[in-house]
A protein has these predicted regions:
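Dynamic "connector" segments at or just before major functional cores
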Residues: 1-200, 224-227, 367, 390-425
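An anionic, glycine-rich sequence signature occurring as long contiguous blocks
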Residues: 2-7, 230-334, 414, 420-425
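Structural motif
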Residues: 18, 49-58, 294, 343-353
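Short amphipathic alpha-helical "interface-anchor" segments enriched in bulky aromatics
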Residues: 30, 77, 140, 312-351, ...
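Acidic/histidine-rich, metal-coordinating catalytic segments
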Residues: 137, 206-215
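Short, glycine-/Ser/Thr-/acidic-enriched flexible segments
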Residues: 139-141, 171, 180-182, 238, ...
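Catalytic cores of alpha/beta
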Residues: 218-222
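Basic, amphipathic alpha-helical segments enriched in Lys/Arg and hydrophobic/aromatic residues
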Residues: 339-400
Length: 425
């Protein structure tokens, strides 16, 4: 039998000037120190309003803050309006105002927005990363109904958009975030995106690029070689490549039945492009068993590279480490709502995707600048639980504002340390 007695006589939600997002001051103060609003001022909009109460920059800034805090629906705008901490520094606009904001975006808006994301990320990488590693990947954003530019994507067996993302491996930052139509091939736009990145990124011959077999393109190889970029790209499963790998093992008298998945054989051979240029194929091979019987031909897994210094195993291990970058994309989609785009018009969805991308980058810049030790590896959702969702009372008296946090908060020592670091920027 369910016990209905309670030690509480009444409950209500009329607690006064209380906020459940007290820890949001860390990120909001950090963004003020970065002068983010000034950067956003350069984004153009098709705005015919006369003496608007809210500028487009103000509304966009609110949407970025909202994304960082994990409020992903337009209806969540009411939470910001009613929150005594969120509405303390600036007037929060209504949900209807946000909806009309999206009517003023255009292709010029998204182009300039994208440039800002690339510029911020490249500036951080140039300052903090000595040997950048660029990981390119395509992903999927599921669509519903008749959303513009949505298409069936055979690889995912679903309708959706097909974004292209390029992360810098050490910093996790998105150097490029391109929302593409559902009909776009996985590597469409890769050279154009790299061109934009290389105008901002310091290149002293120390940049490395990794991509899966979708990026196995001769024009991409040539472009990267011309820009002194070392690349590691998975080779498509052409019969010719498998045959060449098997022949190399035969020539070296290797019995592939002596190698399994946990301990494969690593080998290499070269491809002559012209009289002066070669490319290197690195492969690993191992036996396959099916129904208790060994297959006649080994399983062969190849990458192509212009790196002739690493051993075959080192080159293969370096390529396979790119799998961690797929977790960065998962964080973008899951923790920053980049996997849900609900507008009918494509350009509006592109703005939402860029908001998620910028929020993702801002968090990781904040993480590497302010957070310490194990906190430098936590995902955004973990950060929100640990440092954002703190009960706080907002007290305004004699032109002063005091934030009175819960005394039961267990991470207060670390929080105060992070707060002081933000103030010192």
């Amino acid at each position: 039998m369910i016990q209905t007695n309670s030690i509480f006589d009444k409950i209500n939600f009329n607690g006064g000037n209380l906020s459940s997002d007290g820890g949001s001051i860390l990120l909001s103060q950090f963004l003020e120190k970065m002068n983010l609003r000034k950067l956003l001022d350069s984004i153009p909009f098709v705005d015919l309003r006369h003496l608007p109460v809210y500028s487009n920059t103000n509304i966009l800034f609110q949407q970025i803050i909202k994304c960082l805090l994990g409020y992903n629906d337009q209806s969540d705008q009411k939470i910001l309006i009613n929150d005594p901490l969120m509405s303390l520094k600036s007037l929060i606009c209504s949900q209807a105002t946000v909806s009309r904001f999206y009517d003023r975006v255009s292709l010029n808006t998204t182009n300039e927005f994208k440039k800002i994301i690339t510029q911020l990320a490249c500036d951080f990488v140039n300052t903090n990363i000595d040997d950048p590693i660029l990981d390119a990947d395509s992903t999927m954003v599921t669509t519903c109904g008749n959303q513009e530019a949505s298409a069936y994507i055979h690889h995912y067996q679903e309708n959706g958009y097909h974004p292209l993302v390029i992360n810098e491996y050490h910093s996790k930052l998105l150097l490029s975030s391109l929302l593409r139509t559902g009909s776009a091939y996985s590597s469409n736009g890769i050279i154009e995106e790299l061109e934009q990145i290389f105008t901002q990124l310091n290149n002293t011959g120390n940049i490395r690029f990794r991509g899966d077999s979708a990026f196995y393109r001769r024009d991409l190889f040539k472009y990267l070689e011309n820009n002194q970029v070392t690349y590691y790209i998975r080779v498509k499963n052409f019969k010719k490549n498998i045959r060449e790998s098997v022949m190399d093992m035969v020539m070296n008298r290797v019995n592939w039945n002596d190698f399994d998945y946990t301990e494969p054989y690593y080998g290499e051979y070269t491809i002559q492009i012209n009289k002066t240029k070669k490319r290197r194929i690195v492969y690993k091979a191992f036996r396959l068993e099916k129904d208790g019987m060994l297959q006649l031909v080994p399983m062969v897994y190849c990458i192509i590279t212009n790196d002739f210094e690493k051993s075959p195993k080192e080159a293969m291990d370096f390529y396979e480490a790119r799998g961690n970058s797929e977790n960065f994309t998962k964080e973008l989609k899951d923790d920053f709502n980049g996997g849900i785009l609900s507008h009918k018009e494509f350009v509006k969805n592109e703005v939402d995707f860029l908001i998620s991308s910028l929020a993702y980058n801002l968090y990781h810049v904040f993480q590497q600048t302010i957070l310490e030790e194990k906190d430098q590896t936590i995902r955004m959702n973990t950060y929100r639980l640990k440092y954002q969702k703190i009960a706080v009372k907002v007290i305004q008296h004699a032109r002063q504002v005091t934030l009175s946090f819960s005394s039961a908060y267990k991470n207060k020592t670390q929080f105060i340390q992070y707060w002081n670091k933000v103030l010192q920027i």
